Amino acid sequence: MDTRPLAALNDLEQYRRLFTDVALWAPFVRAVCSRHGLAPCERVRVGIPGTCPAFIVEDRWVVKFFGRLFDGAASYAVEQAAGRMALSDPRIPTANLRAWGALGGEGWPWPYLVFDYIDSISVGEVWPQITAGEKVRIARALGGMVRALHSLPLSPDGPFPRSHEPYAQFLAEQRAGCAERHRECGTLPPHLIDQIDAYLPPIDHLIDRSRPPHLIHADLTGDHLLGRLREERWQTLALIDFGDARTGDFFYELAALHLDMFRGETAPLAAFMAAYRLQSLVDFPRRALATCLLHQFNVFWLLPPELIQQPTLESLARALFEV
Protein backbone atom coordinates (compact mmCIF):
# COMPACT_ATOMS: atom_id res chain seq x y z
CA MET A 1 0.00 0.00 0.00
CA ASP A 2 1.25 3.47 -0.84
CA THR A 3 1.88 5.11 2.54
CA ARG A 4 3.76 8.14 1.19
CA PRO A 5 0.96 10.53 2.29
CA LEU A 6 1.86 9.56 5.86
CA ALA A 7 5.57 10.40 5.51
CA ALA A 8 4.96 13.89 6.89
CA LEU A 9 4.22 12.34 10.29
CA ASN A 10 7.93 11.60 10.74
CA ASP A 11 8.19 15.28 11.72
CA LEU A 12 6.95 16.09 15.23
CA GLU A 13 5.15 19.31 14.33
CA GLN A 14 3.45 17.67 11.36
CA TYR A 15 2.57 14.67 13.53
CA ARG A 16 0.79 16.89 16.04
CA ARG A 17 -1.17 18.51 13.23
CA LEU A 18 -2.07 15.37 11.29
CA PHE A 19 -2.39 12.42 13.67
CA THR A 20 -6.12 13.10 14.22
CA ASP A 21 -6.88 14.13 10.61
CA VAL A 22 -9.74 11.86 9.55
CA ALA A 23 -9.55 12.92 5.90
CA LEU A 24 -5.91 11.83 5.74
CA TRP A 25 -6.35 8.57 7.64
CA ALA A 26 -9.74 7.29 6.45
CA PRO A 27 -8.39 5.48 3.33
CA PHE A 28 -5.82 3.66 5.46
CA VAL A 29 -8.38 2.78 8.12
CA ARG A 30 -10.71 1.36 5.47
CA ALA A 31 -7.84 -0.60 3.91
CA VAL A 32 -7.11 -2.22 7.27
CA CYS A 33 -10.78 -3.09 7.76
CA SER A 34 -11.05 -4.57 4.25
CA ARG A 35 -7.90 -6.61 4.82
CA HIS A 36 -9.47 -8.23 7.88
CA GLY A 37 -13.01 -8.59 6.57
CA LEU A 38 -14.50 -5.89 8.79
CA ALA A 39 -17.47 -4.38 6.96
CA PRO A 40 -19.08 -1.98 6.51
CA CYS A 41 -16.33 0.54 7.16
CA GLU A 42 -17.59 3.82 5.76
CA ARG A 43 -18.10 5.85 8.96
CA VAL A 44 -14.72 6.76 10.43
CA ARG A 45 -14.24 9.22 13.28
CA VAL A 46 -11.33 10.12 15.49
CA GLY A 47 -11.04 8.59 18.94
CA ILE A 48 -10.04 10.48 22.07
CA PRO A 49 -6.65 12.01 21.13
CA GLY A 50 -3.74 10.33 22.87
CA THR A 51 -0.27 9.60 21.52
CA CYS A 52 -1.13 7.38 18.56
CA PRO A 53 -3.50 7.89 15.62
CA ALA A 54 -6.66 6.00 16.63
CA PHE A 55 -9.98 5.92 14.78
CA ILE A 56 -13.41 4.49 15.50
CA VAL A 57 -15.09 2.68 12.62
CA GLU A 58 -18.88 2.32 12.48
CA ASP A 59 -18.90 2.36 16.30
CA ARG A 60 -17.74 -1.28 16.08
CA TRP A 61 -13.96 -1.23 15.86
CA VAL A 62 -10.98 0.90 16.85
CA VAL A 63 -7.96 1.00 14.53
CA LYS A 64 -4.79 2.23 16.23
CA PHE A 65 -1.59 3.01 14.29
CA PHE A 66 1.96 3.26 15.61
CA GLY A 67 4.35 5.72 14.00
CA ARG A 68 8.10 6.05 13.89
CA LEU A 69 7.98 8.73 16.60
CA PHE A 70 7.43 7.87 20.28
CA ASP A 71 9.17 4.51 19.85
CA GLY A 72 6.23 3.18 17.88
CA ALA A 73 7.71 -0.23 17.08
CA ALA A 74 8.28 -1.02 20.75
CA SER A 75 4.87 0.36 21.76
CA TYR A 76 3.18 -1.79 19.14
CA ALA A 77 4.92 -4.95 20.35
CA VAL A 78 4.17 -4.12 23.98
CA GLU A 79 0.49 -3.30 23.49
CA GLN A 80 -0.11 -6.32 21.29
CA ALA A 81 1.56 -8.71 23.75
CA ALA A 82 0.01 -7.20 26.89
CA GLY A 83 -3.43 -7.05 25.31
CA ARG A 84 -3.31 -10.71 24.37
CA MET A 85 -2.03 -11.62 27.85
CA ALA A 86 -4.88 -9.72 29.52
CA LEU A 87 -7.44 -11.45 27.31
CA SER A 88 -6.19 -14.81 28.59
CA ASP A 89 -7.58 -14.15 32.09
CA PRO A 90 -11.35 -13.60 32.45
CA ARG A 91 -10.76 -11.64 35.68
CA ILE A 92 -9.30 -8.81 33.56
CA PRO A 93 -11.96 -7.11 31.43
CA THR A 94 -10.37 -5.56 28.37
CA ALA A 95 -11.10 -4.75 24.74
CA ASN A 96 -10.97 -7.70 22.39
CA LEU A 97 -7.90 -7.53 20.14
CA ARG A 98 -9.42 -8.51 16.82
CA ALA A 99 -6.53 -8.07 14.35
CA TRP A 100 -3.02 -6.71 13.89
CA GLY A 101 -0.54 -6.14 11.10
CA ALA A 102 1.22 -3.34 9.20
CA LEU A 103 0.27 -1.14 6.27
CA GLY A 104 3.58 -1.89 4.58
CA GLY A 105 4.82 0.10 1.61
CA GLU A 106 8.00 2.14 1.43
CA GLY A 107 9.46 3.76 4.51
CA TRP A 108 7.87 3.27 7.91
CA PRO A 109 5.52 0.22 7.81
CA TRP A 110 2.86 1.71 10.14
CA PRO A 111 1.97 -1.28 12.31
CA TYR A 112 -1.58 -1.29 13.65
CA LEU A 113 -3.91 -3.00 16.10
CA VAL A 114 -7.66 -3.42 15.71
CA PHE A 115 -9.84 -3.63 18.83
CA ASP A 116 -13.55 -4.09 19.29
CA TYR A 117 -15.10 -0.72 20.13
CA ILE A 118 -16.60 -0.38 23.61
CA ASP A 119 -19.49 2.06 23.90
CA SER A 120 -18.61 3.60 27.24
CA ILE A 121 -17.21 6.50 29.21
CA SER A 122 -14.03 6.59 31.26
CA VAL A 123 -14.22 6.58 35.03
CA GLY A 124 -12.10 9.74 34.96
CA GLU A 125 -14.91 11.63 33.21
CA VAL A 126 -17.34 11.00 36.06
CA TRP A 127 -15.17 10.41 39.15
CA PRO A 128 -16.33 13.61 40.90
CA GLN A 129 -19.97 12.51 40.42
CA ILE A 130 -19.50 9.03 41.91
CA THR A 131 -20.57 8.52 45.51
CA ALA A 132 -17.98 7.73 48.18
CA GLY A 133 -19.37 4.23 48.68
CA GLU A 134 -19.34 3.49 44.97
CA LYS A 135 -15.73 4.67 44.69
CA VAL A 136 -14.79 2.15 47.38
CA ARG A 137 -16.61 -0.62 45.49
CA ILE A 138 -14.83 0.29 42.24
CA ALA A 139 -11.47 0.31 44.01
CA ARG A 140 -12.12 -3.05 45.64
CA ALA A 141 -12.92 -4.61 42.27
CA LEU A 142 -9.79 -3.03 40.80
CA GLY A 143 -7.67 -4.62 43.51
CA GLY A 144 -8.60 -8.09 42.32
CA MET A 145 -8.30 -7.10 38.68
CA VAL A 146 -4.81 -5.62 39.08
CA ARG A 147 -3.68 -8.57 41.20
CA ALA A 148 -4.74 -10.86 38.34
CA LEU A 149 -2.85 -8.69 35.84
CA HIS A 150 0.29 -8.84 37.97
CA SER A 151 -0.01 -12.63 38.16
CA LEU A 152 0.04 -13.26 34.41
CA PRO A 153 3.01 -15.44 33.41
CA LEU A 154 5.71 -13.74 31.35
CA SER A 155 6.76 -15.46 28.14
CA PRO A 156 10.51 -16.02 27.68
CA ASP A 157 10.29 -14.73 24.10
CA GLY A 158 7.96 -11.77 24.74
CA PRO A 159 8.76 -8.05 25.17
CA PHE A 160 8.60 -8.21 28.99
CA PRO A 161 11.89 -9.28 30.62
CA ARG A 162 11.66 -11.90 33.34
CA SER A 163 14.15 -9.93 35.42
CA HIS A 164 14.03 -6.97 37.81
CA GLU A 165 17.16 -5.42 36.31
CA PRO A 166 15.68 -3.50 33.33
CA TYR A 167 13.13 -1.91 35.67
CA ALA A 168 15.85 -1.01 38.18
CA GLN A 169 17.85 0.60 35.36
CA PHE A 170 14.76 2.53 34.23
CA LEU A 171 14.22 3.91 37.75
CA ALA A 172 17.89 4.88 37.96
CA GLU A 173 17.56 6.79 34.69
CA GLN A 174 14.41 8.50 35.98
CA ARG A 175 16.25 9.50 39.14
CA ALA A 176 18.82 11.43 37.13
CA GLY A 177 17.33 14.88 36.67
CA CYS A 178 14.15 14.03 38.59
CA ALA A 179 13.97 17.36 40.42
CA GLU A 180 14.59 19.32 37.22
CA ARG A 181 11.76 17.49 35.42
CA HIS A 182 9.37 18.43 38.20
CA ARG A 183 10.49 22.05 37.98
CA GLU A 184 9.63 22.00 34.29
CA CYS A 185 6.20 20.47 35.02
CA GLY A 186 5.44 23.13 37.62
CA THR A 187 2.86 21.06 39.52
CA LEU A 188 4.69 20.56 42.81
CA PRO A 189 5.58 23.70 44.79
CA PRO A 190 9.27 24.74 44.65
CA HIS A 191 9.96 23.97 48.31
CA LEU A 192 8.97 20.32 47.76
CA ILE A 193 10.99 20.02 44.56
CA ASP A 194 14.05 21.25 46.48
CA GLN A 195 13.68 18.23 48.78
CA ILE A 196 13.49 15.55 46.06
CA ASP A 197 17.15 14.57 45.76
CA ALA A 198 17.54 14.03 49.50
CA TYR A 199 14.16 12.29 49.80
CA LEU A 200 14.60 9.59 47.14
CA PRO A 201 15.83 6.30 48.67
CA PRO A 202 18.18 3.83 46.96
CA ILE A 203 16.54 2.24 43.93
CA ASP A 204 16.62 -1.24 45.49
CA HIS A 205 14.38 0.06 48.28
CA LEU A 206 11.65 0.61 45.66
CA ILE A 207 11.65 -2.92 44.21
CA ASP A 208 10.16 -5.94 45.97
CA ARG A 209 12.59 -8.65 44.95
CA SER A 210 10.75 -11.20 47.09
CA ARG A 211 8.16 -11.30 44.27
CA PRO A 212 8.95 -12.59 40.78
CA PRO A 213 9.20 -9.91 38.08
CA HIS A 214 5.70 -9.26 36.77
CA LEU A 215 3.72 -7.30 34.22
CA ILE A 216 2.32 -3.89 35.14
CA HIS A 217 0.00 -1.69 33.09
CA ALA A 218 2.11 1.34 34.16
CA ASP A 219 -0.49 4.00 33.28
CA LEU A 220 -3.68 3.17 35.19
CA THR A 221 -5.25 6.60 34.88
CA GLY A 222 -8.93 7.41 34.99
CA ASP A 223 -8.93 7.57 31.19
CA HIS A 224 -8.03 3.90 30.93
CA LEU A 225 -10.88 2.32 32.89
CA LEU A 226 -14.04 2.23 30.76
CA GLY A 227 -17.58 1.55 31.84
CA ARG A 228 -21.03 3.01 32.45
CA LEU A 229 -22.52 5.02 35.30
CA ARG A 230 -26.24 4.40 35.71
CA GLU A 231 -28.32 5.43 38.70
CA GLU A 232 -25.13 6.16 40.67
CA ARG A 233 -23.73 2.66 40.07
CA TRP A 234 -20.59 2.09 38.00
CA GLN A 235 -20.20 -0.93 35.73
CA THR A 236 -16.63 -1.63 34.60
CA LEU A 237 -16.40 -2.79 30.99
CA ALA A 238 -12.70 -2.68 30.13
CA LEU A 239 -9.19 -1.77 31.17
CA ILE A 240 -7.52 -0.38 28.05
CA ASP A 241 -4.32 1.06 26.55
CA PHE A 242 -1.44 -1.23 27.43
CA GLY A 243 1.03 0.77 25.35
CA ASP A 244 3.17 1.67 28.40
CA ALA A 245 3.06 -1.81 29.97
CA ARG A 246 6.34 -3.18 31.26
CA THR A 247 7.94 -5.50 33.75
CA GLY A 248 7.84 -3.52 36.97
CA ASP A 249 6.74 -3.24 40.57
CA PHE A 250 3.51 -2.67 42.49
CA PHE A 251 4.52 0.85 43.57
CA TYR A 252 4.89 2.02 39.98
CA GLU A 253 1.41 0.69 39.22
CA LEU A 254 0.02 2.49 42.24
CA ALA A 255 1.29 5.91 41.15
CA ALA A 256 -1.17 6.68 38.34
CA LEU A 257 -3.93 4.59 39.91
CA HIS A 258 -4.00 6.52 43.19
CA LEU A 259 -2.93 10.02 42.15
CA ASP A 260 -4.84 10.13 38.85
CA MET A 261 -7.77 7.69 38.96
CA PHE A 262 -8.46 8.02 42.72
CA ARG A 263 -7.39 11.72 42.82
CA GLY A 264 -5.41 10.95 46.01
CA GLU A 265 -8.51 9.89 47.98
CA THR A 266 -7.48 7.48 50.73
CA ALA A 267 -10.75 5.53 51.15
CA PRO A 268 -10.54 4.02 47.63
CA LEU A 269 -6.83 3.40 48.20
CA ALA A 270 -7.54 1.44 51.40
CA ALA A 271 -10.16 -0.67 49.61
CA PHE A 272 -7.83 -1.33 46.70
CA MET A 273 -4.98 -2.34 49.00
CA ALA A 274 -7.17 -4.73 50.99
CA ALA A 275 -8.39 -6.45 47.81
CA TYR A 276 -4.91 -6.58 46.26
CA ARG A 277 -3.44 -8.18 49.42
CA LEU A 278 0.04 -6.67 49.24
CA GLN A 279 2.29 -8.61 51.60
CA SER A 280 4.86 -5.98 52.60
CA LEU A 281 3.86 -2.52 53.86
CA VAL A 282 7.29 -1.57 55.25
CA ASP A 283 7.97 2.17 54.74
CA PHE A 284 4.94 2.21 52.46
CA PRO A 285 4.25 5.98 52.18
CA ARG A 286 7.84 6.88 51.35
CA ARG A 287 8.30 4.10 48.80
CA ALA A 288 4.99 4.99 47.17
CA LEU A 289 5.68 8.73 46.91
CA ALA A 290 9.26 8.19 45.75
CA THR A 291 8.00 6.02 42.89
CA CYS A 292 5.42 8.68 41.99
CA LEU A 293 8.25 11.20 41.75
CA LEU A 294 10.15 8.85 39.43
CA HIS A 295 7.17 8.08 37.19
CA GLN A 296 7.65 8.83 33.49
CA PHE A 297 4.49 10.98 33.51
CA ASN A 298 3.44 13.82 35.80
CA VAL A 299 1.00 11.89 38.01
CA PHE A 300 0.45 14.84 40.39
CA TRP A 301 -1.47 17.09 38.03
CA LEU A 302 -5.01 16.13 39.14
CA LEU A 303 -4.40 16.45 42.87
CA PRO A 304 -6.21 19.28 44.68
CA PRO A 305 -3.80 22.21 45.21
CA GLU A 306 -4.40 22.18 48.97
CA LEU A 307 -3.25 18.55 49.13
CA ILE A 308 0.16 19.20 47.59
CA GLN A 309 0.80 22.32 49.67
CA GLN A 310 2.49 20.26 52.36
CA PRO A 311 5.59 21.54 54.16
CA THR A 312 7.67 18.43 53.40
CA LEU A 313 7.67 15.44 51.08
CA GLU A 314 7.40 13.26 54.16
CA SER A 315 4.13 14.93 55.17
CA LEU A 316 2.89 14.70 51.56
CA ALA A 317 3.63 10.97 51.59
CA ARG A 318 1.63 10.55 54.80
CA ALA A 319 -1.28 12.61 53.46
CA LEU A 320 -1.44 10.56 50.28
CA PHE A 321 -0.56 7.05 51.37
CA GLU A 322 -1.26 6.47 55.06
CA VAL A 323 -4.28 4.15 55.16
Where are the language model's segments positioned?
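ATP-binding pocket architecture of kinase catalytic cores
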Residues: 41-165
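An alpha-helical support segment within catalytic cores of ATP-dependent transferases
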Residues: 20-40, 102-106, 113, 119, ...
